[in-house]
């Protein structure tokens, strides 16, 4: 009896001190070290804004080209002195440009937005930003005061396989990362 009781007590103690396993995981942290940091804002016709109005496009064609700039915020002297930079773009893209991310019955079909760097200097650019060309490199002999772009709604060259062209709302978002070199 004593041996049985001792075995029960020792067995209970062994289980009482056992640690429970917990799930593990991984956390990713990203950062960037640059020689210049500053706030970059989109600007249309001298007005800083985070929304670019592409206007309207006829269902049979293209919209009007809308010019805008990415400019360092006032007082960003470190950034305003740089002559070389690159801008990496990401978003919902295809080989033509940026996709329409609007959904539902009111979404336009068969259209995309082109985005083109227009003042790259001696750098690489001038082509539409798309899945094959996501970076515009700026190489200037004097300080880069702004990164100039044009955006335009365009009818896809190929007819959509999901019911053809349809008038409606066009919405897309693009993220950019400026790296000064």
UniProtKB/Swiss-Prot annotation:
Disulfide bond entries: 38-79
Residues at the site labelled Required for stability and transport: 180
InterPro entries per the UniProt record, alphabetical: Adhesion_dom_fimbrial_sf, Adhesion_dom_sf
GO cellular component terms attached to this protein's record: pilus
Keywords: Disulfide bond, Fimbrium, Plasmid, Signal
Annotated site (Required for receptor binding): 154, 158
Signal peptide: 1-22
Gene Ontology annotations of biological process type: cell adhesion
Source taxon at top rank: Bacteria
Localisation: Fimbrium
Similarity field: Belongs to the fimbrial protein family.
Function according to Swiss-Prot or TrEMBL: Fimbriae (also called pili), polar filaments radiating from the surface of the bacterium to a length of 0.5-1.5 micrometers and numbering 100-300 per cell, enable bacteria to colonize the epithelium of specific host organs. FanC is the main component of the K99 fimbriae.
Protein name, entry field: K99 fimbrial protein
Lineage: Bacteria, Pseudomonadati, Pseudomonadota, Gammaproteobacteria, Enterobacterales
